[in-house]
A protein has these predicted regions:
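Short, conserved catalytic-motif segment at the N-terminal edge
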Residues: 1-54, 74, 90-102, 157-162
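Non-transmembrane alpha-helical segments in soluble domains
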Residues: 5, 9, 67-70, 81-82, ...
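Extended low-complexity intrinsically disordered regions
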Residues: 17, 115-145
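Short, charged, amphipathic alpha-helices and their helix-cap/turn boundaries
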Residues: 32-33, 83, 133-164
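Active-site helix/loop module of the DD-peptidase/beta-lactamase fold
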Residues: 48, 71-124, 128, 158
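Short, conserved phosphate/pyrophosphate- and ester-handling motifs at nucleotide-, phospho-/glycolipid
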Residues: 59
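Cytochrome P450
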Residues: 167-172
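Conserved small/polar residues in nucleotide/adenosyl-binding loops
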Residues: 178-185
Length: 187
């Protein structure tokens, strides 16, 4: 185990990663170790069983978890997202893709769980090329390892959607909102 810890420390020291956590089961002996930082800038130490952002790699995991919740009747694909995430009860949309934050209109339909999973809920992503994505970026949404998904949902719920839910496909952060519901239900 010491060699593994030393190897990870070399990667941390070289700046290739902030930290690492591993669990090894060998001959019915469980080894669970952690080293490094959850947030390098703030020097917040990584703790065992921390939550990790693995960005797009979460999508298949979240899809699987969502299907399990649907099978157990904790979630329906046709539920509006404000049923599970009350921060989203007053969503609006931009009047046009070139709009500013003051130029919004009411939604014809609230986004659903199905639309979250299909990237058709009206959200965007800060790496996309549109006004709202720039606003996400300016507010440092989805960057900080020190802010929780709950905090980011609260911030993003204050912003309008890019377009009417269900009207088109647009890659977005929306699948992560399903993750929060899956996490809450599993507690």
């Amino acid at each position: 185990m010491d060699n593994i810890k030393l190897d990870f420390q070399k990667h941390i020291d070289a700046g290739r990663c902030n930290g690492a956590e591993w669990i090894i089961n060998h001959k019915n002996n469980i080894y669970h170790e952690v080293i490094g930082y959850k947030d390098l800038e703030l020097k917040n130490k990584l703790k065992k069983n921390s939550y990790y952002r693995i960005w797009s790699m979460t999508k298949p995991i979240i899809g699987f978890a969502a299907m399990q919740l649907i099978e157990k009747n904790f979630l329906s694909l046709d539920d509006t997202i404000d049923k599970h995430l009350s921060d989203f009860k007053n969503l609006k949309k931009l009047s046009s893709i070139e709009s500013n934050l003051k130029n919004t209109t009411s939604l014809e339909n609230k986004p659903t769980v199905r639309q979250l999973l299909q990237h058709t809920a009206g959200f965007t992503y800060n790496s996309c090329d549109n006004f709202l994505a720039k606003e996400y970026e300016d507010r440092s949404l989805f960057h900080s390892a020190s802010s929780s998904l709950e905090e980011e949902i609260s911030k993003i719920s204050e912003l309008p959607l890019l377009y009417e839910p269900g009207s088109k496909w647009h890659y977005s952060i929306s699948v992560s909102y399903t993750h929060l519901r899956a996490h809450e239900t599993s507690q």
